[in-house]
Amino acid sequence: MKLLNKLTLKNLRLNKVRTIVTIVGIMLSAALITVVSGMALSGRQTMIDGQTEWSGNYDVALDIIDTAKIDKIRQNRNVENAFYKERLGYARTKNADGEICDYSVLAMSENTYGNCFKIDLIKGKFPTNSGEAVVTKSFKTQDGKYVKVGDKITLDVGVLTDKDGNVLDEEGIHNLLQKDFNKCSIIDTVKRTYTVTGIIERPKTSELYDPSNLSMIYTVSDEKAPVEAIKTKHMNKLYIAYTPQSESNYLQNTADILGFKADDMSNVISDEISPEDQQTSGINAYEFNSVLLSMKGYGSSDATNTVIFSLAVII
């Protein structure tokens, strides 16, 4: 071994130029590998950020949940955050100019704003209780004026039905075009009053979708949906974000929360939960944020993983 070292050193001294070129080449190669790896990771993070803005920052959504289950879920050691959202309903008014104005009212837990869904605040602040709300900048009052921070708004908020009188669920609302929305009716209204605390841009998040011409109102939920939420198809959801340490085990985590076997969980919406399982789990359905999970390296989407790997190879 000593002889080999001596021969190597002697060879390096005799070929100084080649030695310097070799050392520089090694340094450049190491630097290039570091730069390429950094660019690949940066590109992956950009994709994750974009998907988070579109779908929301969560791992699984529990659809039509019995709110009595929420506190227990939040106490689960694998859950970092749980964000609650419920659709309070819709309202329709005619302003002083004779213009028909439609409104959508959503209530969310206070920690949802900025943590689960990206909502850009133009002025003011986010609401802190169920008597406060933020509204989109297109919001007009009944006298035809744009609303300001500090104004009080009162609306008759009710359930949306299609032209045939059928109550629309979340899927029906997502499939609703603006021209069809104009034919819908609003029934079983309740008068609701809010103090406007802020003005926001219209969110781009798919989970906050409403037909484009509606003004949107976001308030804070008291998380007291009907006890029979599952049977009455009350439109509410709980979005769960697992801790970084347990996120890779999202299937088992979700199975534990719902009281299912991990083998029964799939990476798609489950719309065939039996009545017995509904009572056990306290939900009507569940859906994983599968694209986001795949981008983080946890999901099973081959297409998403292939795109990320291809980008790294191209770079």
Task: Identify the role of each PLM range.
Residues 3-7, 38, 191:
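Charged, alpha-helix-enriched surfaces in structured cytosolic catalytic cores
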Residues 8, 12, 31, 35, ...:
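Juxtamembrane interface helices immediately C-terminal to a transmembrane segment
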Residues 21, 33, 37-41, 306-315:
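A hydrophobic alpha-helix feature that marks transmembrane segments and, especially
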Residues 41-296:
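Basic-flanked hydrophobic alpha-helices used for secretion and membrane insertion
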Residues 283-315:
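Hydrophobic alpha-helical bundles that form the membrane domains of multi-pass transporters
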Residues 1-31:
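N-terminal Sec/SRP start-transfer signal
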Residues 22, 26-29, 122, 134-139, ...:
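Hydrophobic alpha-helical transmembrane segments of multi-pass small-molecule transporters/permeases
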